[in-house]
């Protein structure tokens, strides 16, 4: 499934791009950088007026109560996907916040821009980056994430971490 990133500075440019793409695209990603440019209004318009699906890439990370409240508020926009950092306590809070909605919580395991030196500087445990990513993916899924965001390098191996389907 194709998800097009609306990495533009404001709602007008986002609507213009979505208009040019028309029916060829049914799913859009709106990131943190677009938030102050009318990102939530853009999400609302694309969803309500044009029937598009929305992936809000916020990578939320805070104390549980704050994440839960933020997700509860964002769920009112009838979003399809929302990213949070994959720490289990963050994922659990997000799952609580989305309760009773169709919003899917996607966990970000490790930012793709980070390398081993960055992880060391941030006191992230030693080890192979791919193995840590898989471990974090498994923990996020156990904590209630609906899915995991991974780099192409980890995506194939992350498929091993899928939640078991209820029989």
Model-predicted segments: where are they?
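Conserved anion-binding
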Residues: 62, 66-166
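Conserved, mostly hydrophobic/aromatic
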Residues: 4, 28, 59, 82, ...
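Conserved alpha/beta-domain cores
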Residues: 6-50, 64-70, 134, 152, ...
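Short beta-strand/loop segments at the ligand-binding rim of alpha/beta enzyme cores
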Residues: 1, 47-58, 101-107, 163-167
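Glycine-rich phosphate-binding "P-loop"
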Residues: 1-7, 54-58, 118-125
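Short phosphate-binding/catalytic loops that engage adenosine nucleotides
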Residues: 26, 51-52, 79, 145
């Amino acid at each position: 499934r194709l998800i097009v990133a609306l990495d533009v500075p404001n709602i007008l440019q986002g609507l213009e791009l979505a208009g040019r793409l028309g029916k060829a695209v049914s799913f859009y990603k709106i990131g943190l950088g677009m938030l102050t440019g009318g990102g939530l209004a853009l999400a609302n318009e694309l969803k309500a007026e044009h029937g598009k699906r929305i992936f809000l890439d916020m990578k939320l990370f805070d104390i549980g109560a704050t994440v839960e409240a933020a997700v509860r508020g964002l769920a009112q926009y009838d979003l399809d996907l929302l990213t949070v950092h994959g720490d289990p306590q963050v994922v659990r809070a997000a799952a609580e916040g989305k309760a009773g909605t169709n919003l899917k919580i996607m966990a970000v395991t490790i930012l793709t821009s980070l390398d081993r030196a960055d992880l060391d500087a941030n006191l992230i445990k030693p080890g192979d980056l791919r193995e840590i990513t898989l471990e974090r993916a498994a923990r996020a899924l156990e904590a209630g994430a609906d899915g995991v965001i991974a780099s192409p390098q980890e995506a194939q191996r992350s498929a091993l971490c899928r939640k078991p389907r209820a029989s």
